[in-house]
Amino acid sequence: MGIKGLTKLLADNAPDSMKEQKFESYFGRKIAIDASMSIYSFLVVVGRTGTDMLTNDAGEVTSHLIGMFNRTIRVLEAGLKPVYVFDGKPPEMKGGELAKRLARREEAVESLATAKLEGNEADMEKYSKRTVKVTKQHNEDCRKLLRLMGVPVVEAPSEAEAECASLCKTGKVYAVASEDMDSLTFGSTRFLRHLMEPVSRKLPVMEFDMNKVLEGLSLTMDQFVDLCILCGCDYIDTIRGIGAQTALKLIRQHGSLEKILENLNKDRYQIPDPWPYEEARRLFKEPLVTQAEDVPDFKWTAPDAEGLIKFLVEENGFNHDRVQTAIKKIQLAKNKSSQGRFVNCLCRL
């Protein structure tokens, strides 16, 4: 879910914190990418015809592999240095949100069955997409693919967004790429949306600067975290009737969730019981992440051509010639990136 209404709130109140950028402007930059978010979008969009998804001869879905392979090649060809971060075990507080997602998927399954009986193709496609879930196997497939491509993979101890933000805050990467705005709540100093969108959508990358977010909203980081909790996050329910603009007004007026709750009109706003905002706040400010000293140096190595042929062509039915061509693209892209870094070094001498 991310943070409800945060993008519009920033556009209205801190417009200088966000700017459109060209994809290629991140040449040579290390970018931490939320892997699960990308895999989900590939499963929903790539190669889908109505309710049918791309599969191999064994009937196993391959949309995630095709999407990850092609999109990562595009990233590498632009000279970017991607680091894919995979989710670990979710915090217990996220159980409520995960249960809601499960309920929505189950409801979508029922609606899909009804649409099939009625022969309503538009509804069939719509509800089919809502049944999509990223599985353990999808993640394992993509981890294997990325390693064969010579791209670094990080296993987060808990939330990928938190791990990405930590890598950014400690200078291990230049920016975080995701579609969930809670990357900012976790403290990403530089956050990118639409980096992994397909070329066909022609969307520019939207870059958010955390310092300018706080400056534009006239908030401290602690107050920004409280604002995001009040807007609505994955950890606790919202207070009905309080949207993003009202949340900002209340935070500016009272300074903290404690003061807001002390002064809130209880007749007008019903506070959920329980409403463990302190624990939600702790998860944003002190998430379970890999300590900076334990993060290894990231290395982008040459692709394992033989391994890629075996995995993609022999095991998953990809076209041999296309995979061979793609491998050459990866090799050329990595050489280009290395040469670019060398030129940059010379320019600084």
From Swiss-Prot:
InterPro entries associated with the record: 5-3_exonuclease, 5-3_exonuclease_C_sf, Flap_endonuc, HhH2, PIN-like_dom_sf, XPG-I_dom, XPG/Rad2, XPG_CS
* Keywords attached to this entry: DNA damage, DNA repair, DNA replication, Endonuclease, Exonuclease, Hydrolase, Magnesium, Metal-binding, Mitochondrion, Nuclease, Nucleus, Phosphoprotein
Instruction: Please share the entry's free-text remark on the cofactor.
Output: Binds 2 magnesium ions per subunit. They probably participate in the reaction catalyzed by the enzyme. May bind an additional third magnesium ion after substrate binding.
GO cellular component labels? mitochondrion; nucleolus; nucleoplasm
Q: Provide the E.C. number(s) assigned to this enzyme.
A: 3.1.-.-
Q: Where does Mg(2+) 1 bind?
A: 34, 87, 159, 161
Q: What SUPFAM superfamilies does this protein map onto?
A: 5' to 3' exonuclease, C-terminal subdomain (SSF47807), PIN domain-like (SSF88723)
Q: Which cofactor does it need?
A: Mg(2+)
Q: Does the keyword Phosphoprotein apply?
A: yes
GO molecular function ontology, one term from the record: 5'-flap endonuclease activity
Predominant location = nucleus
Q: Report residue spans for region: N-domain.
A: 1-105
Annotated region I-domain: where? 123-254
Quote the PTM field.
Phosphorylated. Phosphorylation upon DNA damage induces relocalization to the nuclear plasma.
Amino acids binding DNA: 71, 159, 232, 234
GO term, biological process aspect, one = DNA replication, removal of RNA primer
Top-rank lineage group of the source organism:
Eukaryota
Localization (cell):
Nucleus, Nucleolus; Nucleus, Nucleoplasm; Mitochondrion
Binding of Mg(2+) 2: at which residues?
Answer: 180, 182, 234
| Signal sequence extent | none
Family membership, please give it: Belongs to the XPG/RAD2 endonuclease family. FEN1 subfamily.
Oligomeric and partner information? Interacts with PCNA. Three molecules of FEN1 bind to one PCNA trimer with each molecule binding to one PCNA monomer. PCNA stimulates the nuclease activity without altering cleavage specificity.
Report the protein's function. Structure-specific nuclease with 5'-flap endonuclease and 5'-3' exonuclease activities involved in DNA replication and repair. During DNA replication, cleaves the 5'-overhanging flap structure that is generated by displacement synthesis when DNA polymerase encounters the 5'-end of a downstream Okazaki fragment. It enters the flap from the 5'-end and then tracks to cleave the flap base, leaving a nick for ligation. Also involved in the long patch base excision repair (LP-BER) pathway, by cleaving within the apurinic/apyrimidinic (AP) site-terminated flap.
Q: What is this protein called?
A: Flap endonuclease 1-B
Taxonomic lineage of the native organism: Eukaryota, Viridiplantae, Streptophyta, Embryophyta, Bryophyta
Name of encoding gene? FEN1-B
